Curated annotation (Swiss-Prot):
Protein name: Ubiquitin-conjugating enzyme E2 S
Biased composition (Basic residues): 203-213
Organism listed in the record: Branchiostoma floridae (Florida lancelet)
Active-site residue list: C97
Free-text function comment from the UniProt entry: Catalyzes the covalent attachment of ubiquitin to other proteins. Acts as an essential factor of the anaphase promoting complex/cyclosome (APC/C), a cell cycle-regulated ubiquitin ligase that controls progression through mitosis. Acts by specifically elongating polyubiquitin chains initiated by the E2 enzyme UBCH10 on APC/C substrates, enhancing the degradation of APC/C substrates by the proteasome and promoting mitotic exit.
Domain UBC core, first and last residues per copy: 13-159
Reaction(s) this enzyme catalyzes, per UniProt: S-ubiquitinyl-[E1 ubiquitin-activating enzyme]-L-cysteine + [E2 ubiquitin-conjugating enzyme]-L-cysteine = [E1 ubiquitin-activating enzyme]-L-cysteine + S-ubiquitinyl-[E2 ubiquitin-conjugating enzyme]-L-cysteine
Compositionally biased region (Basic and acidic residues): 192-202
Enzyme class (EC, first level): transferase
Pathway: Protein modification; protein ubiquitination
InterPro entries attached to this UniProt entry: Ub_conjugating_enzyme, UBQ-conjugat_E2_core, UBQ-conjugating_AS, UBQ-conjugating_enzyme/RWD
Length: 213
């Protein structure tokens, strides 16, 4: 994830464009997203995404970063979760796999679209492009185990010290791309209702087991 800044490689026009968009997002963020401008390096865009309600990530605060390359916006930025998460489309090093940041990228999509796509990835994981094969396999074959594992990782690594209201699961806000499912189909959507009734009695035991992950 580490790397030098690419600010010197970007044109003044692109620098102004990115700076303006980041400032606009910081002042008028999408629901469930907070953007933190980095005045020293605008190619390092950091944000926090609230875990959407009705998912195993509910109540979590997930820090992410977008690293803009020297050819941005002709090439997509790289996205990373800085907060540990159990998710099919997030690698162990935090790298995010979503088609919007790969084959479906378009130079005019903008940072807001990327952030909303990543948020919707928490609602609709895509096991077909899994970077975490274990999570993808569990999502498809043993959803209850997947949900419990993801929920406990959220509890350990993403829960803030002070509780905040969970973000509403607003499906209509999800960008329509092939990298995310934007309908109520799929294994994740079908199980949302049961996620809120997780067994609390196993929580302490699972926490101890997962702290070494």
């Amino acid at each position: 994830m580490s790397g030098s800044s690419n600010v010197e490689n970007l044109s003044p026009q692109i620098i102004r464009q990115v700076a303006k968009e980041v400032l606009d997002l910081a002042n008028h963020p999408p629901e469930g997203v907070k953007v933190f401008p980095n005045e020293q390096d605008i190619t390092d865009v950091q944000a926090t995404i609230e875990g959407p309600g009705g998912t195993p990530y509910e109540g979590g605060q997930f820090k992410i970063k977008l690293s803009l390359g020297k050819d941005f916006p002709q090439t997509p930025p790289k996205g990373f979760f800085l907060t540990k998460i159990f998710h099919p489309n997030v690698a162990k090093n935090g790298e995010i796999c979503v088609n919007t940041l790969k084959k479906d990228w378009k130079a005019d999509l903008g940072l807001k679209h990327i952030l909303l796509t990543i948020k919707c990835l928490l609602i609709y994981p895509n096991p077909e492009s899994a970077l975490n094969e274990e999570a993808g396999k569990l999502l498809l074959e043993q959803y209850d185990n997947y949900s419990e594992r993801a929920r406990m990782m959220t509890e350990i690594h993403a829960k803030p010290t002070t509780k905040t209201a969970p973000t509403k699961n607003e499906e209509t806000n999800c960008p329509s791309t092939s990298g995310t499912q934007s309908t109520s189909e799929g294994p994740m959507a079908k199980k949302h209702a049961g996620d809120k009734n997780a067994a609390e009695k196993k929580k302490k035991e699972k926490k101890r087991a997962l702290r070494r992950l």
